[in-house]
A protein has these predicted regions:
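Conserved catalytic core of two-component sensor histidine kinases
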Residues: 10, 37, 44
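Regular, well-ordered alpha-helical segments
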Residues: 18, 26-29, 45, 49-52
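Aliphatic-rich helix starts adjacent to a transmembrane/signal segment
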Residues: 23-40
Length: 111
């Protein structure tokens, strides 16, 4: 193998490695988005469970921890009780570096 062939092989491996690193970052971001959505669904179930037990929606995350809710590390959950019968939940990264997702109890949708 000549020096030129070796340099070509090293260049190709470098290009493939840079593509792979970008893809891994994209997959990690998608996985974290899925974690935030999952946390919202679980928190909504915990809110309903709390309501079933205490006949009101809680204002704090500490309250839904009592009924079994556990969030993913690195996900910040915000609870906003908009009326006695409705609430919204927002999941985001604490540093705000990614999108946030919001669950609305009136529609049951995550946006």
């Amino acid at each position: 193998m000549t020096l030129l062939e070796l340099l070509v092989v090293v260049a190709v491996v470098g290009i493939l490695a840079s593509i792979a690193i970008q893809q891994v970052s994209l997959y990690r971001a998608r996985a974290f988005d899925a974690s935030m959505r999952s946390d919202l669904k679980n928190a909504a179930l915990a809110m309903e469970s709390y309501y079933g037990e205490f006949l009101e929606y809680p204002n704090t995350q500490a309250a839904i921890l009592l009924v079994g809710y556990r969030n993913t590390s690195g996900v910040s959950l915000t609870i906003n009780v908009t009326s006695p019968s409705t609430f919204t939940l927002t999941a985001a990264r604490p540093n705000g570096s990614q999108l946030s997702f919001t669950y609305d109890s009136t529609t049951g949708l995550i946006n």
